[in-house]
C-alpha cells in the first residue's frame, strides 16, 4: 500500500474507535424535558417521607373496590404464557416459550409481578388519583387456565361496577399463534367525571433484563413513542436522575424495551398525547420506565370506548414490521440517513432470504461476506492494481522527490503528471475500505441488537450476538476489555497478512510501524463487538487475501506503468537546416 492508503486506513481505524466511544451510552444525547401537561404526571409522584394514607381513603367513590379476593387467570398459546389478575385487570406475567434468558432459563418479562404492568390512570373531579391496579375487578370468564393453538381465540373480560351509574370494563383477546393481544377499554358514566376528560393507559415498569451482561443491556433499554411521524426516545442512562417526556398529538404507539424484547401499546383510534418516564438504578443497572398513551373521554356521551393492541414479544424486525405501525423504529440501526438503510434494505432482507435455505447463521455470515466481496470485486480489483502500479512507480517518484526537494510546487506538478500518465489514483487503495464503512457500521447495529443471532452459535462462539470470549479476566484492560475473543485475533492476523502481501509504496519506518499498528487497532476495536461482526470481517479479509494472491500471480510486466521522468515543460528542439 502507498503512504496515502495507509494514512487513510489509519484514519478509518481512528474513526472506528472514536465512533465506538461516541456511541457509548455515556455520550449519547440525553432527552430530558419538562412535561407540558401535569395533571396525571405529577399525580403519580409521591412526596418522600410523607405518611401513606390507607388506600380506601384516597379513592373516593372507588373505595369499596379497594378490597377483595384476587383471581389469577393464565392463557397459554404457541408463543407465550400470560397471567392476568382480577386485581387491576392487569398483566402480571409474560413468559415467552421460544426465548430463554442468558442462562437458558424461562423468565417473566414483567418487572413488577406483585402489582402488574398494565393499568388505567386518571384523576377524578374530587381530586382522587385512581390507578386501576389498586381496584378489584370481577372476572366474567371462569377459566383459570386456557390453552390455545393455531387460529383459536379466547377472550377474558373484567368488570368493575363503581356505582350503579359508573362502570369500567376491560377485555383481553388472545389468539393461538400471535404475540399480539387485543385490549379494549369501556368507561360508562364517566362523562365530565375526570379531570381534563382524559385518562392514561400505561405500561408501568421496565422489562426484566434477560442477558448476563446487565450493564450492556442497560445501554439498549429505553422508552419511546412514534408521534406525529417521528420517533420520540427517552433514555434514562444516568443514575439518580429522573427523565420525563410529555407531548400532545397523534401517536401510533408507546413502548418500552430491553435489549431484545419490547412491550408496546398500540391505539386503534386517536390519542391526545404521550407520557414517558424513566429512572436508572445504579446498583443493578436496571432502567425502570413508564410508557403511557393519553386518551380522551367524551364530555357528553355516557359511554367511551377505546381499542388497543398490545405487543409483548421479541424485537424481531420482520415480526414488528408486520404490525404495520412503524414499531420497528424502536430498533436502533444507527444513523437514519446512512446505516439504517443498509440494515433495513440490504443486511436483514439478505439474512432472512438466506435463512430459508441455511439454518446456521455462521454460514449465512460467511456467504454474505462472499457476496459482498463479489459485489465489490471490480472496485477492489481496480484499486489493488492501482496500488501495484504505485509500488512500481516508487523509484521514479523518489528520483523526482530528490530532484525537486527544494521546489514543492514543481514536485506536486510532476507527481500529478506521472500519476496521470500511469493511470493511478494515490488514494485508490483505501476507497474500497471507505465504501465498506457504512455497511460495517450497519452490521454492528444489526448484530448488536437483532434477536436473529441471539443464542445462535458457530464453531467455538456460543452466541454470535456477543463477543466470542474464551477467557474472562475478571477485570477490564483499558481499550481491550475484560476477556479474550478469538475472531478479532484471527481477523487482526488476516489484516497483517493482507498488508504484507499487498504492494507497498513506501518502505520507511513509518510504514513498518503502521503494518503492526493497524491490525492492533482493529483487534482492540473488535474485541468487544459481536462475534458475528468479527466473523464477517475475518472472512471478508480471507477472501481479500485470496484475491491479492491471485493479482500478484497474474500481474505481468506489461501491466506496469512506463512513465517519462522528463518534466512536462521539456520539449525536443525542432530540427532545422544546418548553417
From Swiss-Prot:
Keywords, comma-separated and alphabetical: Cell inner membrane, Cell membrane, Chaperone, Membrane, Protein transport, Transmembrane, Transmembrane helix, Transport
Primary localization: membrane
One Gene Ontology cellular component annotation held by this UniProt entry: plasma membrane
GO biological process, one term: protein transport
Record flagged with keyword Transport: yes
One function term, GO molecular function aspect: membrane insertase activity
Record-linked Pfam families: 60KD_IMP, YidC_periplas
This protein's record includes keyword Cell inner membrane: yes
InterPro entries membership: Membr_insert_YidC, Membr_insert_YidC_N, YidC/ALB3/OXA1/COX18, YidC/Oxa/ALB_C, YidC_ALB_C, YidC_periplasmic_sf
Membrane-spanning segments: 5-25, 333-353, 362-382, 427-447, 473-493, 520-540
Alphabetized NCBIfam families for the sequence: yidC_nterm, yidC_oxa1_cterm
Function: Required for the insertion and/or proper folding and/or complex formation of integral membrane proteins into the membrane. Involved in integration of membrane proteins that insert both dependently and independently of the Sec translocase complex, as well as at least some lipoproteins. Aids folding of multispanning membrane proteins.
UniProt subunit comment: Interacts with the Sec translocase complex via SecD. Specifically interacts with transmembrane segments of nascent integral membrane proteins during membrane integration.
Family: Belongs to the OXA1/ALB3/YidC family. Type 1 subfamily.
Protein name: Membrane protein insertase YidC
Amino acid at each position: 500500500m502507498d503512504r496515502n492508503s495507509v494514512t487513510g486506513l489509519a484514519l478509518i481505524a481512528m474513526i472506528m474507535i472514536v465512533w465506538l466511544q461516541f456511541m457509548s451510552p455515556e455520550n449519547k444525547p440525553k432527552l430530558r424535558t419538562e412535561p407540558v401537561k401535569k395533571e396525571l404526571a405529577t399525580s403519580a409522584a409521591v412526596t418522600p417521607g410523607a405518611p401513606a394514607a390507607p388506600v380506601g381513603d384516597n379513592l373516593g367513590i372507588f373505595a369499596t373496590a379497594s378490597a377483595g379476593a384476587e383471581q389469577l387467570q393464565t392463557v397459554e398459546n404457541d408463543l407465550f404464557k400470560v397471567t392476568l389478575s382480577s386485581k387491576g385487570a392487569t398483566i402480571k406475567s409474560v413468559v415467552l416459550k421460544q426465548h430463554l434468558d442468558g442462562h437458558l432459563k424461562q423468565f417473566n418479562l414483567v418487572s413488577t409481578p406483585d402489582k402488574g404492568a398494565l393499568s388505567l390512570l386518571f384523576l377524578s373531579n374530587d381530586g382522587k388519583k385512581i390507578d386501576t391496579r389498586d381496584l378489584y375487578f370481577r372476572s366474567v370468564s371462569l377459566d383459570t387456565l386456557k390453552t390455545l393453538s393455531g387460529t383459536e381465540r379466547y377472550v377474558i373480560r373484567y368488570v368493575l361496577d363503581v356505582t350503579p351509574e359508573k362502570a369500567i370494563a376491560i377485555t383481553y383477546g388472545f389468539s393461538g399463534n400471535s404475540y399480539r393481544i387485543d385490549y379494549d377499554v369501556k368507561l360508562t358514566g364517566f362523562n365530565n367525571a375526570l379531570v381534563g376528560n382524559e385518562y392514561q393507559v400505561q405500561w408501568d415498569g421496565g422489562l426484566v433484563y434477560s442477558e448476563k451482561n446487565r450493564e450492556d443491556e442497560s445501554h439498549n433499554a429505553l422508552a419511546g413513542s412514534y408521534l406525529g411521524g417521528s420517533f420520540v426516545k427517552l433514555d434514562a442512562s444516568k443514575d439518580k436522575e429522573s427523565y420525563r417526556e410529555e407531548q400532545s398529538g397523534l401517536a401510533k404507539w408507546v413502548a418500552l424495551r430491553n435489549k431484545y424484547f419490547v412491550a408496546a401499546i398500540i391505539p386503534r383510534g386517536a390519542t391526545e398525547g404521550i407520557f414517558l418516564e424513566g429512572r436508572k438504578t445504579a446498583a443493578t443497572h436496571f432502567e425502570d420506565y413508564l410508557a403511557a398513551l393519553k386518551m380522551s373521554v367524551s364530555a357528553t356521551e355516557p359511554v367511551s370506548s377505546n381499542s388497543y393492541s398490545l405487543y409483548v414479544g421479541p424485537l424481531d424486525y420482520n415480526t414488528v414490521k408486520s404490525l404495520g405501525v412503524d414499531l420497528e423504529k424502536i430498533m436502533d440501526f444507527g444513523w437514519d440517513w446512512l446505516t439504517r438503510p443498509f440494515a433495513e434494505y440490504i443486511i436483514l432482507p439478505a439474512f432472512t432470504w438466506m435463512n430459508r435455505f441455511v439454518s446456521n447463521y455462521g454460514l449465512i455470515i460467511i456467504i454474505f461476506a462472499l457476496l459482498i466481496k463479489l459485489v465489490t470485486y471490480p472496485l477492489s480489483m481496480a484499486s489493488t492494481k492501482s496500488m501495484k502500479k504505485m509500488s512500481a512507480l516508487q523509484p521514479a517518484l523518489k528520483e523526482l522527490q530528490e530532484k525537486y526537494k527544494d521546489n514543492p510546487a514543481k514536485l506536486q506538478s510532476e507527481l500529478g503528471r506521472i500519476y496521470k500518465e500511469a493511470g493511478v489514483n494515490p488514494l485508490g487503495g483505501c476507497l474500497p475500505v471507505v465504501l465498506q464503512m457504512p455497511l460495517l457500521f450497519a452490521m454492528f447495529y444489526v448484530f448488536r441488537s437483532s434477536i436473529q443471532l441471539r443464542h445462535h452459535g458457530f464453531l467455538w462462539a456460543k452466541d454470535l450476538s456477543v463477543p466470542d470470549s474464551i477467557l474472562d479476566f475478571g477485570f477490564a484492560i483499558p481499550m481491550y476489555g475484560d476477556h479474550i475473543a478469538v475472531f478479532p485475533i484471527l481477523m487482526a492476523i488476516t489484516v497483517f497478512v493482507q498488508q504484507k502481501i499487498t504492494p507497498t509504496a513506501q518502505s520507511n519506518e513509518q510504514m513498518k510501524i503502521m503494518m503492526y499498528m493497524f491490525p492492533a487497532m482493529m483487534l482492540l476495536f473488535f474485541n468487544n463487538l459481536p462475534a458475528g461482526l468479527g466473523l464477517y470481517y475475518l472472512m471478508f479479509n480471507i477472501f481479500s487475501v485470496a484475491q491479492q494472491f491471485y493479482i500478484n500471480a497474474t500481474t505481468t510486466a506489461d501491466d506496469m506503468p512506463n512513465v517519462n521522468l522528463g518534466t512536462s515543460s521539456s520539449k525536443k528542439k525542432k530540427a532545422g537546416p544546418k548553417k
